[in-house]
Curated annotation (Swiss-Prot):
It is found in: Peroxisome membrane. GO terms for molecular function: ADP transmembrane transporter activity; AMP transmembrane transporter activity; ATP transmembrane transporter activity; coenzyme A transmembrane transporter activity; FAD transmembrane transporter activity; FMN transmembrane transporter activity; NAD transmembrane transporter activity. Induction: Down-regulated by phagocytic stimuli. It is a multi-pass membrane protein. The chain crosses the membrane at residues 21-41, 95-115, 131-151, 175-195, 221-241, 298-318. This is Mitochondrial substrate carrier family protein Q. It comes from the Eukaryota. It comes from Dictyostelium discoideum (Social amoeba). Coiled coil: none annotated. GO terms for cellular component: peroxisomal membrane; peroxisome. May have transport activity.
Amino acid sequence: MSEKIHITQNSGNVDHTVEALGHAISGGVAGMAAIALTYPFSTVSTRLQVQQKKQQQGQQSEITTVPYKNSIDAFKRIIKEENWRTLYSGLKSALIGIGASSFVYYYWYTLLKSISLKLKNKQELGTIENLAIAALAGCANVLTTLPIWVVNTRLQINSDKGIVGQFKYIIKNEGFGGLYKGLIPALILVSNPSVQFVSYEKLRALWRRQSGRTKLGGLEVFILGAIAKLIAGIVTYPYLLVKSRLQSQSGNASNPESQQQQYKGTLDAIGKIFKSDGFLGFFKGMPSKMVQTVIGAAFMFLVKDKVVIHAVAILFYLKRLLNKNNKRV
């Protein structure tokens, strides 16, 4: 998170709204920059997450997903058997998704935090309060943007249909509910940014106390952001894998994609994954995902810290101009 921006104007909640909007814009910009930088790792991780073992003989059907040995093998084979552009399949939907997700998350997180600080007349919130606010912001984010991520997951596996085509296909064959597959694990994954941001703020506060400085340098922000994301990623990765499995499956039995093992819901998916792959099956694709999320989160914090100050300043300037024009009228 950026250094706290002090608000000196006396326009009440409007100031909180403007500040929240500045954080939302900077978060969206930073999120898109980060995912554009690390997207191939996300594609590889998704391929590994949805990959399943072949069923034993005698069972009804055999899963035909091409098995990758590990992240490096997946990188090599995707480039060799398909082409390097495949690593960027679904990038457009991912940019839309991360832009919208970051905007919604940062807007509500900043707004709720600012209002809470004002009501409690405090400079900093406690860990529980921070977690609660982060969770509320995360739920708003999931409910708003989950359909985009369902489409993105499908495109990373099969990019033939495109964004609009994939939306239409899901609605036609699976109904509107198909766009919300994986909702329960996605809501559980709200704890990921909650753990991430609380860890970051606690690490930042500790760093500032130890160094005796109030402003962190770019490298320090990058390192703390990476550590915070690593902590959150390890804790919540199994839920991410379950979410990817649920989102990747098609409700159309005639579709080749549906030849993968079908899950009735979250608990059914957890049980079947554990039965077929064991405990380690919940961590498939984790190395490439950790590279993507840790570097991406660190880069996002770095970019957001640089952008947010200017974004909030511009918004306050525009607000003052608007107020002056209204007074003239």
